[in-house]
Amino acid sequence: MAGDAVTLTVPGPQGDREVRLSSPNRVIWPQPGITKLELAEYLVAVGGPFIEANGDRPVSLQRFPEGIDGEQFFSKNPPKGAPDYVDAVEVTYPSGRHHPQVVIREPAAAVWAVQMNTVVFHPWASRADATDLPDQLRIDLDPY
């Protein structure tokens, strides 16, 4: 419900941003009962280190609209209406296929992704300005 929305103040390199979070009490993890708001507040708290580790890279967003026990999907393209602080870079694959890919450069963009029901962020091993030149080795260890 729209009346249930909250607005979080998220510090960042361009100053504070206000990020609206709808359905803040939606339970994302049934055990131990973590809500969408708690996940967003966590990302506000760890915003600096999160951006240091994942920022300035194309990222795929793994979204769970009904929590982790519900259906999930991956989102790469920034949706229409994304705020101006959510960046994108045009990526091209060896096949020649190309599309815009989300790039998170500040904590407010990560909190916005939670608003879009993102639970897992999958950053590329390369930076947005050189998508064909990985500068990290990343190993994805899934618990299930």
Name each model feature, range by range.
Residues 133-144:
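Short glycine-/aliphatic-rich beta-strand segments at the starts of folded cytosolic domains
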Residues 2-135:
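Active-site loop/lid in soluble adenylation, ligation, and acyl-transfer enzymes
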